[in-house]
């Protein structure tokens, strides 16, 4: 019988409350993106359209659990938003000014807003004390993930914390999980993804 040695956690929706933590940030990013659309662009784009395209109902705040907001990366969200913007606008994937401003908005609106999914410190400490190796694998950026986990007081329990920008691809690409296995000295069959 194979024994589990390594526990690799997703962050949003598992450790942190996705909606409480990230909905205000996503609304701010939609507002910023919308502010770049020229008034004479000839194509109507609204905050509700941008948010709806990634699975957020702007009027009710409800989130589609299968939408990009819940399951994707910001790389994927930018790609969808690009299709809604007028032709000739900046490339949301490549424009360094846009990407820099997005990082600033995420830091400002996300700082201090991480909401844990209940008491995490006690059970995670018990798992660590029992000898399990703990890691986080998320489609968020590594820096943002670390910030949120630090805010709720549990970052010190995880090694590594891997984001979509950590060089292993975003989920469901298996490279991040395999990297966790290698660092923990555990085989994939000895690893549980939560």
Where do the PLM segments sit?
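A general structural motif
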Residues: 2-4, 131, 188-190
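Substrate-recognition "cap/lid" segment bordering the active-site pocket of phosphatases
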Residues: 108-116, 135, 140-193
């Amino acid at each position: 019988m194979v024994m589990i040695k390594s526990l690799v956690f997703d962050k949003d929706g598992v450790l942190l409350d996705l909606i409480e933590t990230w909905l205000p940030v996503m609304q701010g990013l939609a507002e910023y993106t919308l502010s770049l659309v020229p008034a004479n662009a000839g194509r109507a784009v609204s905050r509700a359209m941008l948010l709806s395209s990634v699975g957020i109902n702007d009027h009710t705040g409800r989130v589609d659990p299968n939408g990009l907001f819940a399951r994707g990366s910001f790389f994927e969200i930018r790609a969808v938003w690009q299709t809604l913007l007028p032709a000739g606008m900046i490339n949301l994937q490549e424009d360094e000014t846009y990407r820099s401003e997005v990082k600033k908005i995420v830091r400002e609106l996300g700082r201090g807003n991480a909401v844990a999914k209940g008491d995490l410190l006690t059970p995670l400490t018990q798992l660590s004390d029992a000898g399990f190796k703990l890691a986080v694998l998320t489609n968020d950026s590594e820096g943002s993930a670390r910030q949120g986990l630090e805010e709720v007081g549990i970052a010190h329990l995880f090694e590594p914390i891997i984001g979509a920008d950590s060089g292993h691809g975003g989920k469901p690409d298996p490279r991040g999980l395999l990297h966790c296995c290698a660092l923990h000295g555990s085989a994939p069959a000895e690893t549980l993804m939560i």
